[in-house]
């Protein structure tokens, strides 16, 4: 993904003789990085292991540049709640793998917001819950983007350059005002 973005902005030449694909994973589930047992389905091979198996079987030249970006939710409380409500409370939304993933040549950790502005979070503080189109003030954007990025940097040692909107949603404010003002 980072290579494609650098190419689109003219910072890098892209090899375009073949179609390009970007692998991204949202929310930061442990399945992005490791193989786990999932209730009712047994052992589920992690995405990283699938990529490693591909490289081992076909060689790096079969898919040069194979790489994935895991967009993670920063807030431990939000991850615990999502894990409890959606993943059988098995602890599958931890951050104990982020640093190792960031150091791995096949994966990068990026920003998917502080808490996803997830509707299941009972306490929204001063902000409306339910989606990302309601993130409409500088303060709310800053909390969702910068606070998350700083937390991720503290875990991985690298400030995440990329942000993926939760639910694929965004307000006009975050798209047209907040992010453009953050560019240097």
What residue spans do the PLM features occupy?
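Sec-exported extracytoplasmic/periplasmic mature domains
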Residues: 30, 52, 56, 146, ...
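Charged, glycine/proline-rich intrinsically disordered loops and linkers
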Residues: 37-44, 127-132, 175-184
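Active-site beta->alpha N-cap acidic-glycine motif
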Residues: 1-106, 159, 165
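Active-site environment of divalent metal-dependent phosphoester hydrolases
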Residues: 31, 116-118, 167-172
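Alpha-helical scaffold elements lining the catalytic groove of polysaccharide deacetylases
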Residues: 36, 93, 99-104, 114-156
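His/Asp/Glu-enriched short active-site or ligand-binding loop at hydrolase and phosphoryl-transfer sites
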Residues: 1, 159-160, 169-184
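A short acidic (Asp/Glu
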Residues: 34, 80-83, 121-122, 172-178
């Amino acid at each position: 993904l980072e290579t494609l973005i650098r190419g689109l902005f003219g910072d890098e030449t892209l090899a375009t003789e073949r179609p390009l694909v970007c692998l991204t994973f949202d929310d930061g589930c442990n399945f992005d990085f490791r193989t786990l047992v999932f209730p009712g389905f047994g052992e589920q091979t992690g995405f990283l292991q699938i990529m490693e198996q591909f490289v081992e079987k076909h060689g790096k030249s079969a898919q040069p540049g194979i790489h994935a970006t895991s967009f993670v939710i920063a807030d431990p409380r939000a991850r615990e709640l999502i894990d409890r409500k959606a993943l059988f409370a098995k602890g599958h939304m931890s951050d104990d793998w982020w640093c190792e993933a960031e150091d791995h040549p096949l994966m990068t950790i990026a920003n998917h917001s502080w808490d996803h502005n997830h509707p299941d979070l009972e306490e929204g503080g001063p902000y409306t819950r339910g989606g990302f189109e309601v993130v409409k003030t500088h303060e709310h954007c800053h909390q969702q983007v910068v606070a998350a990025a700083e937390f991720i940097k503290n875990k991985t040692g690298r400030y995440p350059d990329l942000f993926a909107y939760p639910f694929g949603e965004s307000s006009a404010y975050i798209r047209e005002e907040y992010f453009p003002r953050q560019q240097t």
